[in-house]
Amino acid sequence: MQRLFLSSFSLLLGVLSLYAFTKISPKASHSEITFPVMQELQGRVVSLDSVFFRYPYRLEVRGDRVVIEDLHGPDHYYHLYTYPDFRHLHSFGQRGEGPEEMQTVDDFYWNGQTLWALDNIKSELVRWELSDSRDKMLRKERIKLDKATFRALDIVPFQNNSFLIPNYSGDSRFCQVDRNGKLLKKWGEIPTERKDDLQKYPYAFGYGWRSFIDYAPKTGILVAATQFGEVMEIWNVKKNTHKVIKGKLDEPEFKILPEYAIPTGAVGHCDIQVTDRAIYVIYRGVSMKDDMLAHQKGKPLPQGGKTVRVFSLEGEPLKEYKLDHSVSGIWVMEGEGKMWALDVNSDEPLVEYKLK
């Protein structure tokens, strides 16, 4: 597997000294989040034949089928497998610039029958359906997203047949769009302590506060975890409550160039899953400086995180798992007592963990 690193980020850091910039840093410090239980887990590597992965990023298991997303797939971005034996059935989401192809992928949602995938460059949602023979995915439609969604990177199905997308323009936390991609409303705000800077640099804050999101419709719990810094937000949309949790890394730190925001603090979270019982978050906790120095020395740090944190649906710390692999994506199956994870640093990326 080819290992892909953020070389463009390193180049941008290299030219920071050429510009006058504004540095956005947290106003106050927060204590480290502590967990009452910590457990070390040893994973079992599961071979995936027939597919060459460049950057296996996300996976979802639904019934007897699995979809794995390759963020930088050379030919296709998505791969359908059987479960639990992981026999490859079909590759779909062809890479390219044609009308039936995808230029990029970021997030997807799969319920076992219907899959929605997000193409950031084309600003559209694409829908596939599992065939009657259950051995391939059939492309059915594409939906152009409202221009107000701006840089859509993550998406979850939400209430009343709508979709929820983090708003990277910075003037709200989310954009809610209907089944046709039209904006229904914007809501929420970035929970920064630097309100004045947010008003001055909304686009920079929108990017700097990029978050991974997930929603559990049964409980009405919506969670966002920042990629940079260490902030997690929990909404209970049924009870209309909102809680903000800030850890030791605090709010995202970044420097503002003429038209960009460059993260300078630390990478906090990598993925999130909300089940009906708990919140699971991959935590990386590595500073951008350490990441860059290791890369410059030719010894890049593993991508992903080796810690999975478990919170209650109310945000109380429950447990922290220490993994023997650095992983980018997880899929927790509480009923089976296991967690599937993707190690992008390995030629055999699929790892099974037994949860204790």
Residue ranges and their predicted role:
Residues 41-49, 90-101, 140-148, 184-206, ...:
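Surface-exposed loop and turn segments in beta-propeller and other repeat-based domains
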